From Swiss-Prot:
Recorded catalytic activity of this chain's protein: 15-cis-4,4'-diapophytoene + 3 FAD + 3 H(+) = all-trans-4,4'-diaponeurosporene + 3 FADH2
Entry keyword Flavoprotein: yes
Protein name: 4,4'-diapophytoene desaturase (4,4'-diaponeurosporene-forming)
Domain of life: Bacteria
GO terms under biological process: carotenoid biosynthetic process
Function: Involved in the biosynthesis of the yellow-orange carotenoid staphyloxanthin, which plays a role in the virulence via its protective function against oxidative stress. Catalyzes three successive dehydrogenation reactions that lead to the introduction of three double bonds into 4,4'-diapophytoene (dehydrosqualene), with 4,4'-diapophytofluene and 4,4'-diapo-zeta-carotene as intermediates, and 4,4'-diaponeurosporene (the major deep-yellow pigment in staphylococci strains) as the end product.
Database matches in Pfam families: Amino_oxidase (PF01593)
Species lineage: Bacteria, Bacillati, Bacillota, Bacilli, Bacillales
Known EC number: 1.3.8.-
Keyword match Oxidoreductase: yes
Binding-site positions, FAD: 5-17
Pathway assigned to this chain's UniProt record: Carotenoid biosynthesis; staphyloxanthin biosynthesis; staphyloxanthin from farnesyl diphosphate: step 2/5
Length: 502
């Protein structure tokens, strides 16, 4: 069969490879001039920067794409586990290193508050049990009809997840110490959600980091995108770049997706898998006579969106890789207040930031004697933060100054401005324009209870035959391992349909 995949982000690349490995003819259409989507790369002034995701969690999910296509993952990506997850700075003189080794972890916890290990381990145990339930009964399956969700098994297993509790509540149930609470709460920002609003299940991220480890891919995270692109080429997939999709064509008589309009041409296919940002697809790519019924264009703006981010890619003329960790988190003095600012549409004068220094793990990513630094500051998306003008250069200069002051929390970056030889910024406007991300959201639809599982955009269209969706705004959600799972479960359904002649 001839299959079209819209989008060459990590979801599209993984899905296309899985389909092609089953013997089908696959073409990927990508609007930009490179693969990767939000897993993007910037090469500038001799530096190589990952532009999007940077932390490799759940490596088995990465490996599975290659293995299930009959290939050895080591021929495509080089993974290695980190001994330490990150350095966390509460202020200039208060930094802790978070290890993966349990003995070291216990020592770290006891140094913060004697006796805290028991509550921490109880938290990890509770969350691990919830994760296993969620993975088996909710995350790794699709919902094609109401009875797939509304059944006794889902009711019983869902009750065990205690989804009405928020991430903050679960953390505070086990942890009294404010510093340790912060260590467990900030990761919800990895998927763009407020820990006060996110279901307690989303506190799984620190559990995954500590129980499964954090890894690094040689060449940076973009090495995964390159590995997937090579996998697709080896499987005979055709990747068309600079191919802007104008419309998904729906046959009005048979109510099926049978073609796409790309760069002015109509291209026929047997099935279409769309991995572009779902809200933008529902709003702009469906014909007027054939909207996605649950998500017509006029309702898209009313959905809840994850936060966005202001990113900086900085090159400095000194090598500091032996004085800083690969991954670093610098907390705002008022951590809770900063989160409120993000989700209430305000910019912060004292933000929490994430700092990634890839040359710590791979010297080839910066010129000799120099260092590349990636900084992410969570911000409101464009709907909540409608009063923020990201095109205002004076404003972005102010934000850069705020970030440089915050970076000075790490001693080696105290005089960073005098060493800058390269600087690039990426704003919520860029998320919207570059990736067609609705409202510049960095992580797609916010995974609130009302926008999760059965209530999230589904992988198999309920309105039109031969149309499928995958990616961060669809089930099961955002984050690289999760969108790889989205690709897997969607392709599994497509292959099942092909085998059954549906």
């Amino acid at each position: 069969m001839k299959i079209a995949v819209i989008g060459a982000g990590v979801t599209g690349l993984a899905a296309a490879a899985r389909i092609a490995s089953q013997g089908h003819e696959v073409t990927i259409f990508e609007k930009n001039n490179n693969v990767g989507g939000r897993m993007n790369q910037l090469k500038k002034d001799g530096f190589t920067f990952d532009m999007g995701p940077a932390i490799v969690m759940m490596p088995d999910v990465y490996k599975d794409v290659f293995t299930m296509c009959g290939k050895n993952y080591e021929d495509y990506i080089e993974l290695r586990q980190l001994r330490y997850i990150y350095d966390v700075y509460f202020d200039r003189d208060d930094c802790i290193t978070v290890p993966t080794d349990l003995a070291e972890l216990q020592h770290m916890l006891e140094s913060i508050e004697p006796g805290s290990t028991h509550g921490f381990m109880s938290f990890l145990t509770d969350v691990y049990k919830k994760y296993e339930i969620a993975r088996r009964y909710f995350l790794e399956r699709t919902y094609r009809k109401p009875s797939d969700f509304y059944n006794m098994t889902s009711l019983v297993q869902g009750a065990k997840l205690k989804t009405l509790n928020h991430a903050d509540q679960l953390i505070e149930h086990y942890i009294d110490n404010e510093k340790i609470q912060k260590l467990l709460a900030f990761q919800t920002l990895y998927i763009g959600i407020d820990p006060k609003r996110g279901p307690s299940l989303y506190s799984i991220i620190p559990m995954i980091e500590m129980m499964f480890g954090v890894h690094f891919i040689k060449g940076g995270m973009y090495g995964m995108a390159q590995g997937l692109a090579q996998l697709n080429k080896d499987l005979g997939v055709n990747i068309e770049l600079n191919a802007e999709i104008e419309q998904i064509i729906i046959d009005p008589k048979f109510k099926r997706a049978d073609a796409i309009k790309v760069n002015g041409d109509i291209r026929k296919f047997d099935k279409i898998l769309c991995t572009a940002d779902f809200p933008s697809v529902a709003e702009s790519l469906m014909p007027d006579f054939a909207p996605i019924k649950k998500y017509p264009p006029h309702k898209i703006a009313d959905l809840d969106y994850s936060c966005s981010a202001f990113l900086m890619y900085i090159g400095i003329d000194i090598d500091v890789t032996d004085q800083v960790r690969l991954h670093n988190v610098i907390f705002a003095d008022d951590f809770r207040g900063n989160i409120e600012e993000i989700f209430e549409g305000r910019l912060s004068h004292d933000p929490s930031i994430y700092v990634y220094v890839p040359a710590v793990a791979d010297k080839s990513l910066a010129p000799q004697g120099q260092t590349g630094i990636y900084v992410l500051m969570p911000t409101p998306e464009l709907k909540t933060g409608s009063g923020i003008d990201w095109s205002d250069e004076a404003l972005t200069d102010q934000i850069k100054d705020v970030i440089y002051r915050k970076l000075a929390t790490i001693e080696v970056f105290e005089d960073i401005k005098s060493h800058i030889v390269s600087e690039t910024i990426f704003t919520p406007n860029d998320f919207e324009q570059t990736y067609h991300a609705k409202f510049g959201s960095a992580f797609g639809l916010m995974p609130t209870l009302a926008q999760s599982n059965y209530y999230r955009p589904q992988n198999v269209s309920r309105d039109y035959k031969d149309l499928y969706f995958a990616g961060a705004s669809t089930h099961p959600g955002a984050g690289v391992p999760i969108v790889l799972t989205s690709a897997k479960i969607t392709v599994d359904e497509m292959i099942k349909d092909i085998e059954q002649g549906v």
